Amino acid sequence: LGAKYVLKNRSDLRIYKEFSFEYLKSLLGAYPVLGTKVPLKGRIVTFVGATGQLFLPYWLQDFLYFGYTDDIINLFDIKQNERDIANAPAYFKREYKYCTGEDMCREVVPEIYITKMFLSKYINIDDSVKGFWECIKNYFMIVDWEDLSAVLFKYDSYNRNDGDTNGILNWKESHRMISHSICVSIINGYLKYGDWMEKERFNYILHGKKE
């Protein structure tokens, strides 16, 4: 493509903070890739999620990806998913009386599919939080919405943006998002994995109610 870096984002996503591109490039310099099994020039940068994804393996948001051009091309050089699901929320409401984080991981929603298919080209992955965190530590970086003054039209967030968030941070389990600070804590080894984390996705109720 002739460009060293590329930012891939949704067409309804707006970034308003000046020098955002310089900030994203600086993250690649400050946090080099730690692992050697996945051939990346630098980390792949994604946004913090709209729901708590800290314990949902391989759920990295697809609102935005930033990195070296060759790395982002490689990220999307994966087999196309042939499932005929036009509307994921409608599908889950139809198929599940209540939907848990485990259901979302088992069904492999698009964001998870991209991450898992990319990584599985180079390493054996399982659906464990431990493996997920190891990949975050080695290959990814998360930025917060306010880092880029980002606003997303989806979820009517233009009408609910308060200047610091993009309007979506009131979602369930928002306290368990993989924020930038959480990501850095994982990378630097201060946030420690525990076996109890593997069961947490069963407690995420993303819609419906247990009877």
Kindly give the residue locations of the regions a language model identified.
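ER/Golgi luminal nucleotide-sugar-dependent glycosyltransferases, focusing on the catalytic module
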Residues: L1-N9, L13-E211
